[in-house]
């Protein structure tokens, strides 16, 4: 007789086996003791954490050293900041010790492990996610699955998770969780207003969780990371979950397909290179003040069009294309995309071209300049708002200008502030600057016969120009894609 819930045999177990295709290790936790094998306050596994940290940093830390670091992480996770303090450490390290090697796409330094039904406990309260994804022993993500054709399952699970994440007793677990996946292994029904069926992902939140669909656009490059299922590993997963009897059944074989909805989103989000990219560039915190003067923090994860736009920009830059249009971004997604690319392109130009990137967000209305300024500052950028043409002339003719805040600067400017005089000059210093122009609403105000576009093009002939629009114009003499070509 088969044991467990229907979603175990139809969704969870096939998903666990699929993770092994991606190079993850399945670990049984039947013999793992809380506060012996892992820290019960954070669910960080000592052995995986210690081994990975030593490999990454070429150190010989002891178990006690590792526990001290975890203790410091615990203090950060106690903050009422949705894990922002912890995230900074995840990105940059702590006391000179890196917790993740973001360049290790082969998995020789980082540790990639999945477990099932790991208790998230605080006193008498607990919950056990179906699949927990451990990166270097840290539970950075988890997956909840429901049986197929259960139209209320996803909404019910979201409500349940919102109650848990809003409960202060789970604050540390909310902070360490970077994003979650919820799936009932059905295809999306695009007629549904609410996320009723399909596989969705969301960043952690104290309040409402926003579920996003994921539609893969780069399947071929992900196939290269796919491995064959090892029979012994598959049987270990099945026997560890008391479901060895389902092996070979039509339902199990079908659910094991790499093309199932659950397995597709796992491939898209958890392939090693993709996951490292998301953890490095795909997550941001937005801090705002509400009408009552209370500071609110939101955690955002890239929507899939923003992810693929960023990868397209990278690919085109490597091909030597220095200007292009991103045509499918809409609303506030454009500022979010620009923010993510500030982080990404800062590293890209530093590592691949040895240049210091300098960023400009160009709008065609004063109200949009103020709006963009607020959006970028809320995400943590230092913003320089150009007030007049003279200020821009000073800015663009001073390649060595920098700030001492430690933050990357985004210069926000109205297109009308470009003039014949605002042209770059060679540096008097040994500074190789790469200017990057983000052009908001690129279907407006950039007539190829007008002076605005001419002044923009002349300001820096070597600038990278990324035009953002939801409605590219195509017509006689005015074709957005002819001006900037096509990035994505």
Task: Please report, for each region that a protein language model flagged, where it lies by residue.
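ATP-dependent helicase/translocase motor core
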Residues: 2-10, 14-358, 367, 371-383, ...
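Signature of the SF2 helicase/ATPase Hel1-core->accessory helical subdomain module
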Residues: 150-154, 162, 192-212, 419-425, ...
């Amino acid at each position: 007789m088969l044991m467990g819930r229907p979603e175990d045999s139809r969704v969870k177990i096939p998903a666990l086996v699929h993770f092994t295709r991606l190079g993850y290790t399945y670990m049984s936790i039947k013999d793992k003791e809380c506060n012996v094998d892992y820290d019960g306050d954070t669910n960080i596994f000592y052995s995986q954490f210690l081994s990975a940290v030593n490999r990454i940093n070429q150190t010989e830390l002891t178990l006690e050293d590792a526990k001290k670091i975890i203790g410091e992480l615990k203090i950060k996770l106690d903050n009422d900041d949705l894990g922002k303090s912890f995230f900074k450490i995840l990105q940059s390290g702590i006391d000179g010790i890196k917790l993740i090697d973001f360049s290790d796409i082969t998995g020789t330094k980082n540790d990639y492990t999945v477990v099932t039904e790991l208790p998230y406990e605080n006193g008498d309260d607990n919950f056990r996610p179906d699949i927990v994804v451990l990166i270097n022993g840290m539970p950075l993500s988890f997956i909840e699955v429901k049986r197929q054709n259960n139209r209320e399952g996803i909404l019910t699970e979201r409500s349940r998770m919102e109650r848990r994440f809003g409960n202060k007793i789970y604050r540390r677990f909310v902070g360490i969780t970077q994003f979650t996946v919820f799936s009932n292994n059905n295809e999306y029904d695009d007629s549904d207003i609410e996320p009723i069926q399909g596989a969705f992902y969301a960043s952690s939140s104290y309040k409402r969780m926003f579920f996003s669909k994921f539609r893969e656009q780069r399947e071929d490059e992900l196939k290269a990371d796919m491995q064959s299922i090892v029979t012994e590993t598959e049987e270990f997963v099945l026997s560890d979950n008391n479901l060895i009897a389902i092996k070979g059944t039509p339902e199990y074989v079908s659910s094991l397909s790499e093309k199932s909805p659950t397995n597709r989103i796992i491939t898209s989000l958890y392939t090693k290179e993709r996951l490292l990219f998301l953890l490095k560039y795909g997550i941001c915190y937005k801090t705002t003040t509400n009408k009552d003067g209370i500071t609110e923090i939101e955690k955002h994860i890239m929507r899939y069009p923003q992810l693929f736009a960023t990868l397209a920009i990278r690919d085109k830059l490597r091909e030597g294309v220095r200007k292009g249009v991103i045509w499918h971004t809409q609303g506030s997604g454009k500022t979010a995309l620009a923010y993510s690319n500030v982080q990404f392109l800062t590293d890209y130009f530093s590592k691949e071209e040895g240049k210091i990137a300098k960023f400009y967000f160009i709008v065609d209305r004063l109200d949009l300049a103020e709006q963009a300024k607020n959006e970028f500052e809320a995400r943590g950028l230092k913003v320089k708002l150009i007030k007049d043409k003279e200020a821009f002339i000073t800015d663009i003719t001073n390649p060595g200008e920098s700030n001492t805040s430690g933050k990357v600067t985004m210069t926000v400017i109205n297109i009308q502030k470009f003039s014949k005089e605002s042209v770059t000059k060679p540096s008097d210093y040994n500074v190789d600057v790469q200017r990057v122009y983000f052009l908001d609403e690129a279907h407006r105000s950039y007539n190829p016969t007008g002076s605005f576009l001419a002044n923009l093009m002349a300001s820096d002939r070597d600038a990278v120009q990324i035009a953002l629009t939801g409605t590219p114009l195509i017509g006689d003499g005015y074709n957005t894609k002819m001006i900037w070509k096509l990035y994505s």
